[in-house]
A protein has these predicted regions:
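Short alpha-helix boundary/capping segments
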Residues: 158, 190-202
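Beta-lactam-recognizing serine transpeptidase/beta-lactamase-like catalytic domain environment
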Residues: 1-184, 195, 216
Length: 217
């Protein structure tokens, strides 16, 4: 990751992070959304290109991460997430909720997005740290995350973590994207603390039940 960041350089890496919506609100239809933190380019130093790809120097919300994966799953098209699908009037009839419009333009080329989903992220589940998210019937794609929690006084430590897994299925034609993030997982439960052991199995269960439901309805 650090080598990729160095190869891209500060400007391209910064533009890519912003292009996927990090450091800005997604526009989801709920109050109090946080924009996360992405420092302006002028505040990046020579080490930023190696730190940012690992998630250091920035903060992101779960909905931002989910949207980023939805962009990949939708072939590179920028989308605006929403909570409410429809509302009912006093007669019980459905009224469509005015969803925020998604941009038709691609922020990355479809072939690049498809390669990331169907090759790179599938390999994580098949052969890498995301094996615990694998399903028998559907091909899962995704990426594990095990982030150190920064302390105000001592900086990044090695005792507290945020363990996550972001992904979806089926890889060939994605229908569902799921992000599970667990802050300070309890090692005493015997599942360790990594995203592959803590969050990936939860994503597997959610995907299994959701895809089964969609198939039957």
């Amino acid at each position: 990751m650090a080598k990729i960041g160095q190869k891209m350089g500060k400007k391209k890496l910064y533009d890519g992070v912003r292009l996927f919506g990090f450091g800005q609100k997604t526009g989801i239809d709920v109050p109090g959304e946080d924009s996360g933190i992405v420092r302006s380019l002028r505040k990046w130093d020579g080490y930023s290109v190696t730190r940012v790809p690992f998630g250091h120097e920035i903060t992101a919300t779960v909905i931002q991460l989910a949207r980023a994966y939805c962009i990949l799953a939708n072939g590179g098209s920028l989308i605006t997430p929403y909570i409410v699908q429809a509302v009912f009037d006093e007669n019980g009839e459905i009224k469509k909720f005015p969803h925020p419009s998604s941009l038709a333009s691609h922020i990355i080329k479809p072939e690049v997005a498809n390669w990331i989903v169907r090759e790179a992220l599938v390999d994580v589940v098949k052969e890498g740290t995301g094996k615990s998210a694998a399903l028998e019937k559907w091909q899962v794609f995704g990426k594990t995350g095990t982030a150190d929690i920064a302390d105000k006084e001592s900086g990044y430590g090695s005792t507290n973590y945020v363990s996550s897994f972001a992904g979806g299925a089926p890889a060939e034609h994605p229908k569902v994207v799921v992000v599970v993030s667990v802050r300070k997982p309890k090692k005493s439960l015997g599942k360790g603390y990594t995203g592959g052991r803590v969050a990936a199995p939860v994503v597997k269960e959610i995907l299994q039940k959701t895809l089964t439901y969609l198939e039957q309805n």
